[in-house]
């Protein structure tokens, strides 16, 4: 796998280096015990950890945000990750204090430490940064940069955000995409740029504004053949197309979108009016009538009951589209699947995606969590760890973390000499302020290895 314009682990030899490894392992937590309810994101970073295990690995991560009930220490994450990989991980209950810096400096090759929740620091979460450059001059970055050689990131789920530990190391040291980040970028780029055809996108969920922006971006790329709208997004598209979905369902969409309603409506209207041949809409639905699932055709609308699922006839029409597709992108549930009586539509689409021979890309969030909970991750081509970041990527929105990786590639790739060395201005605290060269830090030449070499 190769990601254009980004340094990856295939380009580097990190043996003996101190590696800052930024991850997004933000996980659901049981309120009373503080135990992790899902370790999927921890498991997702294991391939990168295996690749850099001969380094001195310093893990950086966040859990939730200040003021939330699940804003906790990273201790439980550290303990669970240690169990998963079967190796000792030292937890440091701090981020960049003198104690934390001293512990990092004492590390030996093969050691792994896990720093505490980076969002405990105001400059990580309490400040709005207008550019990646502003994050580079923060205290957390300058202090950690003095004791580190390379920055590796698997924090794709936060790639649409900007903060010191996500985007601040660009010009301090080489910034490299980990295995997870590389796979996310590569798979989602394929969904946008050059997917196998025919290409079917199934877009649902309650975040209608995100889904219709993704749809419009896919259409603008000219690579998608059919877009099937399901879930609340499907309800919005039915409304836009002239079906009266009932005041209760209209109000739910208006309220959930709030200030974004008009923009989402306008985008949905453009899609419907300009590309009707590309749109697949439900032909029947299921509503909740006093706790009972009731099937309805569109001719029976309007309804004052909440629409919680697509109908069986809709699924019958969707199945051959999935079967005949060469690529399927699915983001967002088709139903209120947390209620057993209304899980049917979402589960059926999942079954279609696991049974097809097509390339299947699951777009993160609730859809990805469902794939994990049902143990079928190995039956889809790519199950994204992102939620908002996946939608931002597919919508064509700015991705500060990926921009940082690209900038670092330009900053350091161009300094690699024919001898396989990289000129590197980053200095450790105890070193003299001279331009420094790290032999073979950044190049594994084609057809050969890039030696583990000296440190300077």
Question: Where are the regions that the model predicts?
Answer:
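Conserved small/polar residues in nucleotide/adenosyl-binding loops
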Residues: 425-434, 449-456
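Short, C-terminally biased terminal segments at protein or domain edges
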Residues: 442-445
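Intrinsically disordered, low-complexity regions enriched in small/polar residues
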Residues: 310, 425-426, 440
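Active-site loop-to-helix "anion-binding N-cap" substructures in soluble metabolic enzymes
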Residues: 1-421
